[in-house]
């Protein structure tokens, strides 16, 4: 039985980290694509040469030709311009929309049966555009956002409570931006909801509110520290978790930017919601009940995403 083929579109910081993680986990053979000749080939060769030391069996190929992604089982899209200090994810809209058109056409022509995970920002608008440009089924095109945002939330909570991250669960819904909605009521430590932990004196509401805000600002915090780019280790790890759920039919319940058609009262748009990922792609959107305040925050986030979608339509009139 042939190993799965995983195409990574974009050989920047996230793309290179993805290639390394996929090889280490032996999820499949890697094709690293980029338009900058030499970069994907050099990174693929460097990672491949670590194989004898790290003891993984995986083929890695760098390329500038979309034909090399032919038949890929999974495509992870990181191509585009990263954030720099002072930029919001939304500032990237015009530049990265053109990139999504090119990538969508390349995937449609060469890997139409792939499960496509988009990481390019502004995420919710880019995955929506990518699905239209590629024409792939909506359940096979998804955005990586909630897994990363929830991981950041979990990290901050584990630090605050001085407990293992393995015992912390957290949910972040909504758009991948300043309006994201970390749900404290659905987040737990070993099954104990965060509001109960506040009542038990483990933390204060003020500290919890600060953690929620730090989660919203998580990407910007790293951009500000790095000064020359944006996060790449945690985004890559988050996308690999999604790819693994698909390839191994794990039926993981993960928050992702998924297509909504009636769920949460939304129609014909992508936004961060709880999903089940298995061999069918996004097999289910889990329509959880939101409280009044949670719904108001979620609606605000949805409206921000809709604004980006309208801006995209103004740039490219082929989008509907």
Curated annotation (Swiss-Prot):
NAD(+) binds at residues 10-15, 34, 96, 119-121. GO terms for biological process: lactate metabolic process; tricarboxylic acid cycle. It is an enzyme of class 1 (oxidoreductase). The active site is at residue 176. It catalyses: (S)-malate + NAD(+) = oxaloacetate + NADH + H(+). Keywords: NAD, Oxidoreductase, Tricarboxylic acid cycle. Its EC number is 1.1.1.37. NCBIfam families: MalateDH_bact, PRK06223.1. Belongs to the LDH/MDH superfamily. MDH type 3 family. This is Malate dehydrogenase. It comes from Dinoroseobacter shibae (strain DSM 16493 / NCIMB 14021 / DFL 12).
């Amino acid at each position: 039985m042939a190993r799965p083929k995983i195409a990574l579109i974009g050989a920047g910081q996230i793309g290179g980290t993805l290639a390394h993680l996929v090889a280490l986990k032996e999820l499949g053979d890697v094709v690293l694509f980029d338009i900058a000749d030499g970069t994907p080939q050099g990174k693929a060769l460097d990672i491949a040469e670590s194989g004898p030391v790290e003891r993984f069996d995986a083929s890695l190929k760098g390329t500038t030709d979309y034909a090399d992604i032919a038949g890929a089982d999974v495509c992870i899209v990181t191509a585009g311009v990263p954030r720099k200090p002072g930029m919001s994810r939304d500032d990237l809209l015009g530049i990265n929309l053109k990139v999504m058109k090119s990538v969508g056409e390349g995937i449609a022509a060469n890997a139409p049966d792939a499960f496509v995970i988009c990481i390019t920002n502004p995420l919710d608008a880019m995955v929506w555009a990518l699905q239209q440009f590629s024409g792939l089924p909506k359940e096979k095109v998804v955005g990586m956002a909630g897994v990363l945002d929830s991981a950041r939330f979990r990290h901050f909570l584990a630090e605050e409570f001085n407990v293992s991250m393995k015992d912390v669960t957290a949910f972040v819904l909504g758009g991948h931006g300043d309006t994201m909605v970390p749900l404290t009521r659905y987040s737990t430590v070993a099954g104990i909801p965060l509001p109960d932990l506040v009542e038990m004196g483990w933390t204060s509401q003020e500290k919890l509110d600060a953690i929620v805000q730090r989660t919203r600002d998580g990407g910007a915090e790293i951009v500000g520290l790095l000064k020359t780019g944006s996060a790449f280790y945690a985004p890559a790890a988050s996308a690999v978790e999604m790819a693994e759920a698909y390839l191994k039919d794990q039926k993981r319940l993960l928050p992702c930017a998924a297509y909504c058609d009636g769920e949460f009262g939304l129609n014909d748009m992508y936004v961060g919601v709880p999903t089940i990922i298995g061999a069918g792609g996004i097999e289910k959107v889990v329509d959880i009940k939101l409280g009044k305040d949670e719904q108001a925050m979620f609606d605000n986030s949805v409206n921000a995403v809709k604004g980006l979608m309208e801006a995209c339509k103004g740039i490219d009139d082929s989008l509907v």
